[in-house]
Amino acid sequence: MAKSKTKHRLCSRESSVSSLLASCSLSDSNSSNSDGSYHYKDKLYRSASQALQAYIDDFDLSQMYPGTSTGKINIDEDFTNMSQFCNYIYKPNNAFENLDHKKHSNFISCRRQTINDIDSMSLTTDDLLRLPADGSFSYTYVGPSHRTNKKNKKCHGRLGSSDVEKNPNFQGPSTPVGDKIELLILKAKRNLEQCTEELPKSMKKDDSPCSLDKLEAERSWENIPVTFKSPIPVNSDDSPQQTSRAKSATGVLEDFLNNDNQSCTLSGGKHHGPVEALKQMLFNLQAVQERFNQNKATEPKEEIKQVSEDDFSKLQLKERQF
């Protein structure tokens, strides 16, 4: 019953480690240990994943039944593999150097530097079992030769970029990616130079007409010439009423023309569309009609005043005669 329960628990999603081990194939050539073997509770396992799976089963049983206990996985293999694994991790591309015990102890007093955190490493099951129980790693430091190599690489990279700009056929000690970047930069510069040379001369000149002027010239339907009739001269023999009416009419026309010129200057000389032009003409005509009506209303009052003054003068003359 206990075994069936553990199998059911292994298949469930409650145990994340067991589900990961069940879903991932850990028995490939990289994670398997062909040279050594693994002992767990008097049983021999060929791969570390099988031994770890048995340990997980016992751990699940110990969580369900307190009487059961887990054992210890023993590795029948020399410790040289562990040192090879450490060298493989801490010497990528031969960039780091190992020191003997005296140099190592002297450097620890000055500075300690680890390469990567344990959680950020990608380790297989065999590597995890080879790690020490306390999880400690040996300290390494960046050697002076590595620093000088970096400086030399930077200097070579700078010289390569300057030489490529001067001479396109120059081949410096740079990486293929750097060569591609330099070639792309040179191509972009050449394309820009060709584009500037192919620009039309009319666009470079300062005397070229503006685009707004060209558009206004093309929109000839808006530039309709407006003609105004010249005012009719008024004879001096006419009555004062006719002269006052003519003066009011000419004044209204002058005001209309002045308002039109002001609106053109305020709008910046821009031509309006046909609908807007019609609206403005209607508004101006309404304003002219209102002013004309006001002048008509004021004219009879002036005539009445003139008649009353004439009558009063006539009455005074009659009284003097009598």
From Swiss-Prot:
Sorted UniProt keywords: Phosphoprotein, Secreted, Signal
Signal peptide: 1-31
Region (Disordered): 148-175, 228-248
Regions of compositional bias (Basic residues) in chain numbering: 148-157
Family annotation (Pfam families): LAS2
Localization per Swiss-Prot or TrEMBL: Secreted
Feature: compositional bias, Polar residues: 236-247
Keyword Phosphoprotein listed: yes
Modified residue annotations for Phosphoserine: 161
Record has Signal as a keyword: yes
Protein function: Might play a role in cell proliferation.
Name the record gives this protein: Lung adenoma susceptibility protein 2 homolog
Species: Macaca fascicularis
Name of the encoding gene: LAS2
